[in-house]
């Protein structure tokens, strides 16, 4: 019976998707910096004509400060725009579409309005996108390594996250986190990172939600009934399963956290040899 209900839901989604295309709905990337003035508990109105956006956390709650020592805050003169994950004392993993000319990286941060004693700030020494040191493709290979200009010191609130030892199993319980919006379609940016527990979803669900999308090197994650998702502003942050980074927040459909419309994540394990080779100096 459960299988029948899932298949019926997928059929409904396919029909809804086809109708949205007939009605002129558009799938594309939606990307912008998040201005510092929008931080806090105020709600910011935005005009969104796109159905795909960079991702944020919805349906979750504030992360415990001690539970995200690997989470990196990426910002520039325009404000916060992405998150990243500390892999070791000099390398951060994020999404390729988070590439900017003037990136700064803050480690050991929780509340964006509070300065912490062990907080550290770095800038990139180099940025590397998969298969190219110059051209960062945004969606087909949405992964980027940033080498820091100087090593960071581990502390109570700064510590690397492990790379995956194996790919995640379908149905795995995972956690995604970030400083992205906690409401949609209106956006509300929190002062602190939020965490939400979601699952790695089976390929038929992903195929039904995004029938024209290549499923190579990506994961779909969320909950079938909706209500929990990454959303606008969470891009580049980690999807963590069993204490390892298995995904990088990439994109999804807007509004976020809808029925049978999961978030899309770069599958880190598919790039594990490239990541290890770069870090090893190859």
From Swiss-Prot:
Disulfide bridges in this chain: 63-195, 82-98, 174-241, 206-220, 231-256
Glycan attachment positions: 41, 45, 135, 149, 153
Superkingdom classification of source: Eukaryota
Ranges of residues in domain Peptidase S1: 57-280
Listed EC numbers: 3.4.21.-
Tissue expression per record: Expressed by the venom gland.
Cleaved propeptide residues: 19-56
GO CC, one annotated term: extracellular region
Subcellular location: Secreted
Enzyme class: hydrolase
Keywords: Disulfide bond, Glycoprotein, Hemostasis impairing toxin, Hydrolase, Protease, Secreted, Serine protease, Signal, Toxin
Active site: 97 (charge relay system), 142 (charge relay system), 235 (charge relay system)
GO-annotated molecular function: serine-type endopeptidase activity; toxin activity
Family recorded in the similarity comment: Belongs to the peptidase S1 family. Snake venom subfamily.
Record's function text: Snake venom serine protease that may act in the hemostasis system of the prey.
Protein name: Snake venom serine protease NaSP
Organism: Naja atra (Chinese cobra)
């Amino acid at each position: 019976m459960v299988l029948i209900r899932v298949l019926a839901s997928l059929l409904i989604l396919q029909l809804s998707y086809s109708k949205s295309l007939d009605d002129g709905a558009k799938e594309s990337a939606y990307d912008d910096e998040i201005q510092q003035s929008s931080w806090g508990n105020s709600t910011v109105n935005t005009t969104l004509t796109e159905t795909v956006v960079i991702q944020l956390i919805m349906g979750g709650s504030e992360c415990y400060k001690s539970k995200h020592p690997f989470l990196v805050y990426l910002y520039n003169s325009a404000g916060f725009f992405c998150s990243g994950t500390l892999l070791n004392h000099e390398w951060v993993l994020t999404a390729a579409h988070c590439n900017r000319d003037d990136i700064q990286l803050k480690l050991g941060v929780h509340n964006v309005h509070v300065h912490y004693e062990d907080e550290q700030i770095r800038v990139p020494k180099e940025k590397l996108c998969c298969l190219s040191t110059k051209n960062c493709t945004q969606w087909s290979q949405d992964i980027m390594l940033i080498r820091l200009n100087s090593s960071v010191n581990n502390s109570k609130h700064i510590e690397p996250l492990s790379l995956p030892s194996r790919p995640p199993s379908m149905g795995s319980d995972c956690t995604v986190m970030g400083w992205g919006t906690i409401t949609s379609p209106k956006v509300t940016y929190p002062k602190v990172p939020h965490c939400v527990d979601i699952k790695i979803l089976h390929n038929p669900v992903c195929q039904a939600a995004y029938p024209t999308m290549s499923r190579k090197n990506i994961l779909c994650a969320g909950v079938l009934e909706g209500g929990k998702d990454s959303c606008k502003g969470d891009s580049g942050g980690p999807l963590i399963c069993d204490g390892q980074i298995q995904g990088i927040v990439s994109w999804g459909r807007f509004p976020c956290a809808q029925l049978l419309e999961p978030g899309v994540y770069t599958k880190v394990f598919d790039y594990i040899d490239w990541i290890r080779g770069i870090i090893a100096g190859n």
